[in-house]
From Swiss-Prot:
Residues 204-358 form a coiled coil. It comes from Arabidopsis thaliana (Mouse-ear cress). PROSITE patterns: MATH (PS50144). It comes from the Eukaryota. Gene3D superfamilies: Apoptosis, Tumor Necrosis Factor Receptor Associated Protein 2, Chain A (2.60.210.10). This is MATH domain and coiled-coil domain-containing protein At2g42480.
Length: 370
């Protein structure tokens, strides 16, 4: 008779996003440790079915010659516990050993089923496993249990509850010297010894967890302190921020003014720029002094810069005006020169005419004498 309650229930969220093999945590059934694993996209590239397997857990902690004999089946459900698939139960027992750590179904559910609309609810898949009638041999020095769903299992001569077998195996695996020296014949003494051993192991584990929790808390405190300091550095006080902004903006304004001064100097009007240079020096000295805490300093600097801009503008207009006057003066001089050139040209013409006339009169006179 199969138990109506599954031995283990494996819930997988975001199943459609899974590609690689998925393994469950270890669980105990009948005093033995097991775990499930499945291939959501098939065991190989050519497979078009999901694969399901039941495997022995922590096999390295078992003695040589260990084995498990069991029947089992899988039930695959959706989020609302609707059964989507149930595997068949084999007639023969499956023998789990070193050569065969796992048994299962290579072709369980077709992958095409998962593409059907509404097949999976909220992208969640649930796998339940039912295990029955097993024989467990823990290898050299281990005991044998043949009862169906036994409540206890014998480990190195000591009867332990199935729920505690994981802890006992863990102790013997991590400390094999205890298992080698543990050979009492008195059953009462065995039980008390195992209880003391389990309690001591739990106590040490709890202390280790407390220490780890303390270390984690300290790490979190340091992280919070670092984050707090970073926030304090990033959140600069308003006074300092205004001063820094003034400094940066004023550097740009000063650079711009200096470039304009250089352009004016290129026009060879040095005498008219002396006052501007002195004012620029005053501004540079004022910038090096400590700024007031309130924002009025920013407004004062902006007004000061505006005044400088106006002075520059007026000086540029003066320069442009003088340049224009000079150009006009040069133009009038050119006109006078042109007029003089015309007068000279006219005089030359008159002289040439007079010379020509004199030459003509002389020629006629010689002709008459002859």
């Amino acid at each position: 008779m199969w138990n109506q309650k599954p031995c283990f229930r494996f819930e997988i969220d975001n199943f459609s996003e899974k590609k690689d093999v998925i393994a469950s945590k270890a669980f105990v059934s009948g005093g033995c440790e097991w775990f499930l694993y499945l291939y959501p996209k098939g065991q190989s590239l050519n497979d078009d079915h999901m694969s399901l397997y039941l495997s022995v857990a922590n096999s390295k902690s078992l003695g040589s010659g260990w084995k498990r004999s069991a029947k089992f089946y899988f039930s695959v459900l959706n989020e609302s516990d609707k059964e989507l698939y149930r595997s068949t139960i084999s007639q023969e027992f499956c023998l789990f050993c070193v050569q065969a750590l796992a048994w299962g179904i290579r072709k369980a559910l077709p992958l095409s089923k998962f593409e059907e609309k509404g097949f999976l609810e909220k992208d969640k898949l649930i796998v339940e496993v039912y295990i029955k009638n097993f024989e467990a041999v823990d290898g050299e020095g281990g005991g044998v249990s043949k009862k169906e769903e036994e409540e206890t299992v014998e480990i190195i001569g000591s009867q332990d509850y199935a729920s505690q077998v994981t802890l006992v195996r863990k102790i013997f695996a991590e400390h094999p010297e205890i298992a080698e020296e543990f050979k009492p014949k008195n059953q009462v003494f065995k039980k008390e010894y195992m209880n003391i051993l389990r309690n001591a192991y739990r106590k040490v584990s709890e202390l280790a967890e407390v220490k780890m929790d303390w270390v984690k808390s300290k790490i979190e405190e340091v992280s919070l302190e670092i984050k707090k300091r970073n926030d304090e550095v990033s959140e600069v006080p308003l006074d300092n921020k205004i001063a820094d902004d003034d400094d940066d903006d004023y550097d740009e304004w000063e650079q711009d003014i200096e470039e304009r001064l250089k352009n004016l100097e290129g026009m060879e009007f040095d005498s008219k720029l002396d006052s501007l240079k002195s004012k620029l020096d005053e501004i540079s000295l004022e910038r090096k002094k400590s700024y007031d805490a309130d924002g009025s300093r920013v407004q004062q600097l902006e007004e000061r810069v505006k005044d400088i801009e106006l002075i520059l503008k007026s000086k540029l207009e003066e320069v442009s005006s003088e340049k224009k006057k000079k150009a006009d003066a040069d133009g009038s001089l050119e006109d006078r020169v042109k007029n003089l050139e015309l007068m000279v040209s006219d005089l030359k013409v008159e002289v040439d005419n007079e010379k020509a006339k004199s030459s003509a009169d002389g020629f006629l006179l010689v002709e008459e004498v002859a």
